[in-house]
Curated annotation (Swiss-Prot):
Residue spans crossing the bilayer: none
Subunit structure: Associates with TRM2 and TRM3 to form the tripartite terminase complex. Interacts with portal protein.
Protein name stated in the entry: Tripartite terminase subunit 1
Residues in C3H1-type zinc fingers: 182-210
Main location group: host cell
């Protein structure tokens, strides 16, 4: 079924991409007949597939099925809107305003979640990152909310995600931020060597590439110029050559001449001193070649880029005449063209955002390098090229001079000393020159690194990104967890949660038997890991070939949710080596997993106490009566869900995290719901004795 679903998703997403492009095209160029035919075919698919897909997602979902449901809804709405706009014969400005410039904003949502203990959360959503952060936090407290309330709230959150998804594979730049790490970023950081650095210090420097995945776009510069050449049209002049570019070409020519001079040398040949000198100069100058690109220049790279953009727009008139069209088409970017400042953030039609960032970097470096100190540093750095020119022009090298010469300064070749005033002044001046050179050289390197780093940040922020799979995968994992809980407790189990004197006496018998027992220290350590495993959220449970230990998985779950250190300390102190039954056994009868009105912090701690009691009491019960009762979680996608009496379920004690039916004892095809742990243990003892007697 997954293959068929993926095939449908591929076709629907391709249609969504085409429809997204058509919504920005000149309405006069649209084929209304083909559009109407496509709309009819899609409505047939929409009416057949969408109801079945919703039923499937209400039973068990995947990231692919959730996204496909949203695409079907959004494409249907977009086709209807585009059909209405084309039928009304609007002007291009009115057409695009109706499609894209609607003043109503639907990118904000408030969702209410009702937890146990009558504690409610009013969730404010604006970005995709808000949804992902909430998923991680809900995963860390999944045992504090009922499945019904969780599914109701998750439905609202998914509808909000569907609105953000739209039909474009490119999310809007106002829908996400890339400097907030997601759960996948945390997993990657945990696998990299940290050299003693904490996760809190490493995660802020992480640029998330999972929620919205960076895409390597096709180069735009030169693409349309090549199309004009193929049509036989004269292309506009390229970006004018500047003195900076002339110098760069000159430096490149020197480098190529140097490589030609040593090109005749091979591995079996003799290494002459001239070849060795040229090779060393080429090597040592290669690390600084990028810093010499932006010296003195007369015009801005950004100005040249904008000029080229304007020239290419003018050539569209010639292109329209060549194709026999009446005037140029009026697409969206013709009616609402961005100004120069907006182009810095969105790029142009004939240049990409990467081209804009590169030009901005060059202009910034030019402004810095025009300072006197950095100009001197550049000149000294270009001595490599000067020496290469002399070596190639002279024909014969002065080997002794070239191997020892490093600076023409006379002060570097004479010793400074003596007590005469002029010698002391000369020494001070020499030291001042060396200090200024060092400061200029270090500052030059720091400026280059800073410009490069800021350019990388701009590329990460403004670069092309596509919708990732993280949001839908996390949504499906949480949705399935609560769906399975709701489906499991809805099975025809026998309800034994009502107060009964017999079960009360049975509960007292088990408690009195456990009070005089004790767990070993080595046993407590194993049970602590089992406790950690039960309170680990569904998003942090990974089924891999090399699973992490339960304590590591729980730590990652809490770290992803942003839990504070004192809260983590409380978890670690729930079970200690010398713990005794009186420390965890609750005296109340039939009150297991019941919560009073309190906030989420007390709810969470109370849930930990219940789960601790379950783990330790069951273990002590097994040890005392030599039983093998296992603690299990609600199964995922069990084939027995549709049967009157479920088959194929493992015998054991199921923890559902539901206040109405927290404990379910399953034996073969039968099951019983309990609200008292020790009454359940007595019932299991009777069942096991009965089974042993039959054997």
């Amino acid at each position: 079924m997954a293959k068929e679903l993926a095939a449908v998703y591929a076709d629907v997403s391709a249609l969504a991409m085409d429809l997204c492009l058509l919504s920005y095209a000149d309405p006069a160029t649209l084929d209304t007949k083909s559009l109407a035919l496509t709309t009819g075919k899609f409505q047939s698919l929409h009416g057949t597939l969408l109801p079945l897909l919703r039923r499937q997602n209400a039973h068990e979902c995947s990231g692919l099925s959730l996204e496909l449901e949203h695409l079907l809804e959004n494409v249907a709405d977009a086709l209807t809107t585009l059909g209405v706009c084309t039928s009304r014969k609007l002007s291009p400005e009115e057409h695009f305003s109706l499609l894209h410039l609607d003043i109503t904003c639907n990118k904000h949502r408030s969702v209410r979640f009702n937890f146990y203990g009558n504690w409610a959360l009013e969730l404010k959503l604006s970005l995709i990152n808000d949804v992902e952060i909430f998923f991680k936090r809900l995963s860390s407290v999944f045992y504090c909310i009922g499945s019904g309330s969780a599914l109701e709230g998750l439905g609202e959150v998914l509808r909000f995600v569907g609105k953000l998804r739209g039909i474009s594979p490119v999310p809007g730049p106002d829908l996400y931020v890339s400097n907030l790490p997601c759960l996948e970023c945390l997993q990657e950081v945990c696998l990299t060597p940290n050299q003693g650095t904490s996760l809190q210090a490493m995660l802020p420097d992480t640029a998330c590439s999972h929620i919205c995945t960076p895409a390597c776009g096709e180069p735009v510069r030169g693409l349309f110029e090549n199309e004009l050449k193929q049509l036989g049209l004269q292309t506009p002049e390229s970006i004018p050559t500047t003195p900076c570019q002339s110098r760069v070409r000159q430096d490149d020519e020197i480098r190529q001449s140097s490589l030609m001079a040593v090109g005749d040398h091979h591995i079996f040949g003799e290494v002459t001193r001239s070849v060795l000198e040229i090779s060393n100069l080429i090597y040592w100058s290669s690390g600084h070649s990028d810093a010499t690109c932006d010296g003195d220049r007369d015009c801005s790279h950004l100005a040249s880029l904008f000029t080229h953009e304007a020239d290419m727009h003018k050539r569209r008139v010639d292109l329209a005449g060549c194709l026999g069209e009446r005037g140029t088409p009026k697409h969206f970017f013709d009616c609402f063209r961005p100004d120069s400042l907006e182009t810095l953030f969105c790029g142009g039609l004939f240049s990409s955002v990467e081209d804009t960032i590169e030009s901005l970097q060059k202009d910034c470096s030019s402004a810095f390098y025009q300072q006197v100190n950095y100009t001197t540093a550049l000149q000294k750095q270009n001595e490599f090229y000067v020496r290469l020119s002399k070596l190639l022009a002279a024909g014969q090298l002065n080997l002794g001079k070239c191997s020892t010469e490093s600076c023409p300064s006379e002060a570097r070749r004479q010793l400074v000393g003596g007590d005469k005033p002029e010698e002391v002044l000369r020494d001070a001046k020499h030291r001042q020159e060396l200090y200024l050179q060092k400061v200029a050289r270090d500052g030059f390197k720091k400026l280059s690194d800073c410009i490069r780093h800021q350019g990388h940040i701009l590329s990460q922020t403004l670069g092309l990104r596509l919708w990732g799979s993280v949001i839908y995968n996390e949504a499906s994992a949480l949705q399935n967890h609560f769906l399975h809980r709701a489906q499991f407790i809805s099975l025809p189990w026998q309800d034994l949660t009502v107060d009964c004197p017999t079960r009360f006496e049975n509960s007292k018998y088990i408690k009195n038997s456990l009070y005089c027992q004790r767990l070993g220290r080595e046993h407590v350590e194993i049970l602590t890991l089992e406790f950690y495993k039960l309170i680990t959220g569904p998003l942090s449970k990974r089924h891999t070939l090399f699973p992490s230990p339960p304590n590591v998985t729980l730590a990652q779950c809490f770290e992803a949710a942003g839990m504070l250190p004192h809260q983590k300390m409380m978890v670690s102190e729930m079970i200690w080596p010398s713990i005794e039954p009186k420390d965890w056994i609750e005296p109340n009868f039939n009150q297991f997993y019941s919560f009073e009105n309190q906030d989420i912090n007390h709810l969470q701690k109370r849930a930990w106490e219940y789960i601790r009691e379950l783990v330790l009491s069951v273990s002590l019960y097994n040890r005392t009566w030599e039983r093998e009762l296992k603690i299990l979680l609600t199964p995922q996608g069990s084939p027995g869900f549709k049967e009157p009496k479920p088959a194929g379920l493992t015998t054991g004690l199921y923890l559902t995290f539901e206040t109405s039916a927290p404990l379910v004892l399953v034996d073969k095809k039968y099951g019983w719901i309990f609200k008292d742990l020790y009454a359940l243990l007595y019932h299991h003892l009777q069942l096991s004795n009965h089974n042993d007697s039959q054997v």
